[in-house]
Amino acid sequence: MENDKASHASPSIGVNEFVVQGEISIDDSERSVKSVSVSISDDEDSKTDVQDNMATPSTRSKFQTDLAIDNRLLEKDPKYKKLFTEKRRRRRPESCINLMTKGKGTGQKDNINDQIFSLRILPGSDLNSLKDSLWIIKISTQPDVEKTIARAFSDFYWLYHQLQNNHWGKTIPPPTRSNILVEKDEFAINHLFMIRNNEKYDPIFNFKPEYIISLQLMAMIKHIFNDKVLRLDSNFIDFISWDDDLPESLQIVVDDSTFTGDKILMTSSQFRELKEFHKQSKKVESITNSHASLIPVTELTEIYISPTKLFSRKDYQRLFQPQSTDNTFNNNDPLIQEWIPKSKTLFTSLSFGSSAPTYQEASTEIQACHDWVSISKEQWKQLLYHVLQYIVDEAVKVNSVINEFTECLKQISLDEVIRANSELFLKFSKLNESFLKKFKGASRQDILKLIILFDENVRFCESFESILNQRLKLGKILSIIEVDLDKKKNFLDKLSPGNNNSNNEDLKIRTAEDEYRIVLKRYNRVKQSWEKIMEDILNERKEFEKREAAEVNSCLKSIRDLNMDEKKHYLQLWQDFVPDEHISQ
C-alpha cells in the first residue's frame, strides 16, 4: 500500500483492536444515534439487509418496564388515549420551507412532485490545501427560499465512501482527487491553450481551479439527487442538512454560472452546524464500520467491506468479539484475516495470501464488465483530450483572424483619407471587438460543458471499478467460507457413520452439526450479497450507457445551437450596422 494509506494506521494495532475498538457498539442503549446507516439483525436466522439506512431499534430498552394503563383514564379524556395508543413521531424544527408553505391548503401538496431544486456550490476558503478547503452549498426550491450550509472538501469524500458502504453496487461520480483539469498535465486546459496560442496567455480562457472543482462537486450532488435510492439515504439528507422530506420525483437544476472567485465567508451558525455534522458523521462511521473517512482521497477505487453489514449480529459477535479473558481471538482464521490490516494499513487488500483460496470470477458478464470499464475509461480520457485540442485550436484560429481583421480596420481608420470613412472603419472595428468578446465567452462555455461531462464519465468509470472490487472481495470471502463449509461437512460425515450411541459421540455430533449449520447460514448470507451485487453491476452498466449517450447528444446539440445563435447574432450586427450608417450619412 502507499505511504498515504500507511499514515492512517498504527504499526502496533492488534486485530481485535482493529475490529472492535470504536467500530460498532453492541450495547442496545448506545444504538439510538441519529441517521444510523446499518441495521444488524438480532436473530441468527434473519437475513434482512440494510435498507435505506434505518436503524433497527432494540426489542426491549434497558430501562423499559411493564406499566399497566388504567382504561378508565383513557376513556375519561381523549388526549390520554391519543398519548398512549398512537405512535409518537419525532418533532423536527420547522424549516423555512415549512413556514412558507404552511397554511396554503392542499393545492401546494399536489405540486410537491413538481418542485425544482436549484443547486449552487461556491468556494468558502482559499485552495491552498484542496482537502482542507471549505465549500458553501446553496439549495433553493422557490424564490427567496434557500438552504445554505458549509462543508469541507473531505466531507464530499466521506459522503462518497459512506454511500458506497450503504449501497453495494451503486456507482457515484466521486469528487475530483486533485486539480486534474487545471494542472500542467495532458488534461490541462490552460496549458493547452497557451501552447496553441504561441505561449501568449489570454485571461478570458483562464479556468480558475475553484470554478472547475465546484462544477465537479455539483455534478456529484446532482447525480445523487437524480437517483431515487441515493437521495433518500439518511446520510445524504444529513449531509445537505435537509429537514423536510424530499419529493419522490424532483428536478435538480445546476447553477453553473461563473463567479468572481471571491470566497464566501461562513457565518457563525454555519460553522457550528459544520462542527455538529463532523461529530455526527464520526458516530455514523463508527456504528456502520464503513471507514469512510479513513480511505485516502487518492484511491477512488479502494473499497472496504463492513463486516457489520455483511454478517448477522450474532455471527459478527461470534467472529470478532473476544471469546476469552486475554481479549484475543483466532488470528489464523482465513476469514478473520480478511479484516486484518495488511502492510500496516486499515484496508482490505485484493492481493490475497497463499494460505487463502484464490477467487476466480466465474461470471462471463462480470468479466466483460472488467474489460469494458478499462477500455471505456481510457477512451473517455483520450476523447476529452482530443475534443479539447479541437475546440481550443478552432477558438485560437477564429480569435486570431478576427483580431487581425480588427487591427487592420483600426489602422485604416487612423489614416483618415476621408474622415467619414475613417469613422466608419472605427465603428466597424468596435463591432468586431464586441463580437470577439462574445465569441470568447461562448467558446469558454463550450469547453466547460464538454470537459465536465467527459470528466464526470471518467470518474464514473473509477466508481464502477470500485463496485467491481466489491464483487471481487465478496467472492473472495465466499470462497473462504465455502472451504470452511466443506471441512465442517466432511468432519460431520466422518462422525456420523462411526457413531456408537455413546454420550461423548452424541455430543461431538451435535457440536459438529451446530458448527456446520452456522457456517451454512453464513455462506448463504454472503452468497446472497455476492449474487445481488452482480445484478446491480449489470444494471449500472446499462444505465450508464443509456445516460452517457443522452447526455453527450444533449451537450453537443446545445453547443451546436449556441454556435448557430452566435452566427445569427453576428449577421444581425452586420444588418443593423449597414442601415445605421446609411441613416447617419
From Swiss-Prot:
Q: Show the InterPro entries listed in the entry.
A: AH/BAR_dom_sf (IPR027267), PX_dom (IPR001683), PX_dom_sf (IPR036871), Vps5_C (IPR015404)
Q: Which domain of life is it from?
A: Eukaryota
Q: Please identify the protein, giving its name as recorded.
A: Uncharacterized protein YKR078W
Q: Name one GO molecular function term.
A: phosphatidylinositol-3-phosphate binding
| Coiled coil feature spans | none
Q: Where is this region: Disordered?
A: 27-59
Against Gene3D superfamilies, the record matches this protein to: Arfaptin homology (AH) domain/BAR domain, Phox-like domain
Which BP terms in the Gene Ontology apply to this protein? Answer: protein retention in Golgi apparatus; regulation of TORC1 signaling; retrograde transport, endosome to Golgi
Q: Which Pfam families match?
A: PX, Vps5
Q: Mind giving the lineage of the organism this protein is from?
A: Eukaryota, Fungi, Dikarya, Ascomycota, Saccharomycotina
Miscellaneous comment in the UniProt entry for this protein: Present with 1270 molecules/cell in log phase SD medium.
Q: What does UniProt give as GO cellular component?
A: cytoplasm; cytosol; endosome; vacuolar membrane
